[in-house]
Amino acid sequence: MAQLSAQRRMKLMALQLLLWQSALWSGREAVPLVTVSALPPSLPLPRSFLLKSLEQVRKIQASGSVLLEQLCATYKLCHPEELVLLGHSLGIPKASLSGCSSQALQQTQCLSQLHSGLCLYQGLLQALSGISPALAPTLDLLQLDVANFATTIWQQMENLGVAPTVQPTQSAMPAFTSAFQRRAGGVLAISYLQGFLETARLALHHLA
């Protein structure tokens, strides 16, 4: 049993790495995010905001990992190559954080992309409603944590005076027509979210 658990974890790590790389480099498939037309000079971000954001990232990543392990163990949806192809067929969107890369870090654009991306993944998690009665509490908590993180980012943008006058509208979400699609879509959406959050975590460290 220990060997099977270790193999399952290795497959899960491979899935997250592959999908993270796909999310980072598939710019053409990324959902359009809010752009900021006029970028004022960057102001130092409060340490309290950075610490709170990093803690929220850690909490979401931990819940996401638990949910991925449960989906992998229960439904055997653990083969990266199959899931990536399924993601294309289901139209699972991914958010880009091009403005948050260490090579081209732009504070205002990064915050805007962070907020838009979190709203996207919040919508995806909502679309997964009914994935499994046993997983519903964890999924609901994950969705709430993502929404709270998005609020934290938006409030900081308002404090800096760089928030758009109107919050971005949510993109159309994929329509899952079967329990299998919803569960497979859950694995993909949460894996994309994990990669997104890892980029966000690195960016927040740079902004600090």
UniProtKB/Swiss-Prot annotation:
Keywords: Cytokine, Disulfide bond, Glycoprotein, Growth factor, Secreted, Signal. O-glycosylated. Its main location: secreted. PROSITE patterns: INTERLEUKIN_6. Glycans are attached at residue 169. InterPro entries: 4_helix_cytokine-like_core (IPR009079), GCSF/MGF (IPR040117), IL-6/GCSF/MGF (IPR030474), IL6/GCSF/MGF_CS (IPR030473). It is found in: Secreted. The keyword Signal applies. Disulfide bonds join 72-78, 100-110. It comes from the Eukaryota. One of its GO terms (cellular component) is extracellular region. Gene3D superfamilies: 1.20.1250.10. SMART domains: IL6. The keyword Cell membrane does not apply. Residues 1-30 form the signal peptide. One of its GO terms (molecular function) is growth factor activity. GO terms for biological process: granulocyte colony-stimulating factor signaling pathway; granulocyte differentiation; immune response; positive regulation of actin filament polymerization; positive regulation of myeloid cell differentiation; positive regulation of phosphatidylinositol 3-kinase/protein kinase B signal transduction; positive regulation of transcription by RNA polymerase II. Monomer. Belongs to the IL-6 superfamily. Granulocyte/macrophage colony-stimulating factors are cytokines that act in hematopoiesis by controlling the production, differentiation, and function of 2 related white cell populations of the blood, the granulocytes and the monocytes-macrophages. This CSF induces granulocytes. This is Granulocyte colony-stimulating factor. It comes from Mus musculus (Mouse). The lineage of its organism: Eukaryota, Metazoa, Chordata, Craniata, Vertebrata.
